[in-house]
Amino acid sequence: MRLPVLVLCVIGACSNAPKRDDARALPPAPSKPSGAEPMVAIETAQGEVNVTVEVVATRPKIERGLMFREHLPPDAGMLFLMGGETDHTFYMRNTLIPLDMIFITKDMTIAGIVERAEPRTETLRSVGAPSLYVLEVNGGWTAAHQVKSGAKVRFVRVTP
């Protein structure tokens, strides 16, 4: 009795028939941006500039932010959905790269910008005005793209 069961197990393992779980398998993650990523579009005097964003909304993810990251691609950032409009403060503890912080109001206007926040510091940074969202990008990005306070912002594929 053991030999027929063993033979059936070996034949089943060598079969080319699709496995039951194959239909539910997820496709591999794309290695390049697909064009369907969430983005923030910002109005400037030269036209609109776009930032591909990672969106964070939970307290643990907001608190971790971009800590321990050694690199942030150009024109990429992290969008914090803060959950309430107030004068938010950020620090750079365990953040390894300089960042610009763009504070955005509920009416989608830039309330203020902290430029080139120094990495690995605990200095509290804010713009002294209420915001509902904060966008972090590479240090110097806002100056390079001439992004200014008062500019209008819109979200693309982001659900606040």
Locate the predicted segments by residue.
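Sec-dependent signal peptide recognition
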Residues: M1-V7
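C-terminal motif of bacterial Sec signal peptides marking the signal peptidase cleavage site
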Residues: V10-A13
